[in-house]
């Protein structure tokens, strides 16, 4: 069974491949995006749960930024905008997954 850290690292690799395909406007790219939606959503849900624990324990976490990134991802998906999706994945989703990795590795 894969660890949460391994799952997130593998997803980051997949997203980076999708970003490259989006920038090259490959035919199959939206199928790849659709395939990864559930995994991205699951990772972000676990991140939000972890963030809530941090907040409940008196810590700080920019959960509003994470929620905005999810909204941006959904907007790009609904618009089928390759540039917006590539930017959202590369500069928002992947960066947030790296933050989540740091949280997981602190355990």
Predicted regions and their residues:
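C-terminal-biased regions
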Residues: 1-107
């Amino acid at each position: 069974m894969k660890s949460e850290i391994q799952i997130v690292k593998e997803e980051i690799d997949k997203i980076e491949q999708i970003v490259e395909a989006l920038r090259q406007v490959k035919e199959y790219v939206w199928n790849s995006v659709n395939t990864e939606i559930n995994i991205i959503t699951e990772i972000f849900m676990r991140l939000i749960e972890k963030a809530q624990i941090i907040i409940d324990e008196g810590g700080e976490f920019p959960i509003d930024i994470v929620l905005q990134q999810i909204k941006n991802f959904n907007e790009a998906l609904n618009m089928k905008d390759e540039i917006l999706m590539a930017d959202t994945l590369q500069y928002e989703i992947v960066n947030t997954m790296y933050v989540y990795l740091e949280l997981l590795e602190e355990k």
